Amino acid sequence: MSFTPGKQSSSRASSGNRSGNGILKWADQSDQSRNVQTRGRRAQPKQTATSQQPSGGNVVPYYSWFSGITQFQKGKEFEFAEGQGVPIAPGVPATEAKGYWYRHNRRSFKTADGNQRQLLPRWYFYYLGTGPHAKDQYGTDIDGVFWVASNQADVNTPADILDRDPSSDEAIPTRFPPGTVLPQGYYIEGSGRSAPNSRSTSRASSRASSAGSRSRADSGNRTPTSGVTPDMADQIASLVLAKLGKDATKPQQVTKQTAKEIRQKILNKPRQKRSPNKQCTVQQCFGKRGPNQNFGGGEMLKLGTSDPQFPILAELAPTAGAFFFGSRLELAKVQNLSGNLDEPQKDVYELRYNGAIRFDSTLSGFETIMKVLNENLNAYQQQDGMMNMSPKPQRQRGQKNGQGENDNISVAAPKSRVQQNKSRELTAEDISLLKKMDEPYTEDTSEI
């Protein structure tokens, strides 16, 4: 008994695209017994991954049952935790949930400015015993292959799964069981780039690779590989950015003027909608740290959500549903302190909430989360304590810098008592000289 993902189990002999000798015929391979010509054009199925290209022949594709996972951040490893990583497929039991993710190295292309851009790879899932590594045993160390299996699967035997026929079977949008931790820096095709940050079931209700949406090419003037490729959207986006004078690979330079505009734009939002960053710090958005706002310290106060440690904390943030339905809410009217006295006063309310976020040591990244929390919870108390222990000396009004600070510092002695400006008592010799100075002057007339 063989299983078909997305369908009820069926026999291998039921495949309508197989010849009598049991060899699978791909849609782009020549088959004289079938007429696929329509108005001079030939239908071509979408390729999901390719194997090696034989000399003198077309690229033979291996069709995955699922949509791909694309990397969008360099330097991120593709990996799943043990027991995770096998996509959900109706009709496939847990005992057959085993296989591998295959890295498809996409080609580079030339942008409008003449530079070569290498597209980041895309990964596709194949059941054990199928795809480009059908003959390899589970767990074999192969570059570009990551093995995954459920806890109920026997990895010593191939999965009893039919190969996908793109002419009759559409690709299934990739999604995982609840609790699956997706690789960071990757997104599921069609699910948006927020998918890697979600620890719950991936929301990949997206476009599926469909045999009905076939790329058309002129049979007389074009080769079979000249249709629309999965990389064309990235190429078009890069060409548009190049025409606009922007480079998608280079970060935009932030000037003082743009930083001021960004900060003002953030501050114009309601307080609960602000996201502090490098241009608008935590203190500018929410005020100084204290007993009521006791989170943040060091670099996180400067960088806000731009801090490299913040994304792992965002995993703990509640959803809107959890906020409203999992918290104790209280509505209170407060005094309006904004606006001028001559302006009409507005009624101001506060929706106060009290709740908790519960997690345990099995949470992915638990040690890092605890480290970041311990460094930032009540960090203002440590900063205030350091300021009280070593206060900056205050200079008195009218006193020059350095005056009165070091009274015991020895200096060079003056050259004379006059420079010292010190008084002393007169000696007998001094008094005698003063008396002589007071006597009238008489000319000496004695002769020699």
Curated annotation (Swiss-Prot):
Q: Where in the cell is it found?
A: Virion; Host endoplasmic reticulum-Golgi intermediate compartment; Host Golgi apparatus
Enumerate the residues binding RNA. Answer: 106, 122, 164
> Which Gene Ontology terms of cellular component type are present?
host cell endoplasmic reticulum-Golgi intermediate compartment; host cell Golgi apparatus; ribonucleoprotein complex; viral nucleocapsid
Instruction: Outline the extent of the CoV N CTD domain.
Output: 259-384
The PTM entry states: ADP-ribosylated. The ADP-ribosylation is retained in the virion during infection.
What is the designated name of this protein?
Nucleoprotein
Question: Where primarily located?
Answer: virion
Q: Where is the CoV N NTD domain?
A: 61-190
Name the Pfam families on file. CoV_nucleocap (PF00937)
Residue ranges of the region described as RNA-binding: 52-194
Q: Where is the composition biased (Basic residues)?
A: 266-276
Q: What is the lineage of its organism?
A: Viruses, Riboviria, Orthornavirae, Pisuviricota, Pisoniviricetes
Q: Which family does it belong to?
A: Belongs to the betacoronavirus nucleocapsid protein family.
Q: Provide the function of this protein.
A: Packages the positive strand viral genome RNA into a helical ribonucleocapsid (RNP) and plays a fundamental role during virion assembly through its interactions with the viral genome and membrane protein M. Plays an important role in enhancing the efficiency of subgenomic viral RNA transcription as well as viral replication.
Mark the residues carrying the PTM Phosphoserine: 167, 191, 390, 423
Molecular function via GO: RNA binding
Low complexity composition bias: residue spans: 9-22, 193-214
Q: What InterPro entries is this protein classified in?
A: N_prot_C_CoV, N_prot_N_CoV, NCAP_bCoV, Nucleocap_CoV, Nucleocapsid_C, Nucleocapsid_N
Question: Which residues in this protein are found as Phosphothreonine?
Answer: 174, 427
Q: Write out the biased-composition intervals (Polar residues).
A: 29-38, 45-55, 399-409
Region described as Disordered: spans on this chain: 1-55, 157-231, 266-298, 385-448
Q: How does it assemble?
A: Homooligomer. Both monomeric and oligomeric forms interact with RNA. Interacts with protein M. Interacts with NSP3; this interaction serves to tether the genome to the newly translated replicase-transcriptase complex at a very early stage of infection.
Regions crossing the membrane: none
Region Dimerization, as annotated, extends over 266-384
Q: Does the keyword Transcription regulation apply?
A: yes
User: Which SUPFAM superfamilies did the record assign?
Assistant: Coronavirus RNA-binding domain (SSF110304), Nucleocapsid protein dimerization domain (SSF103068)
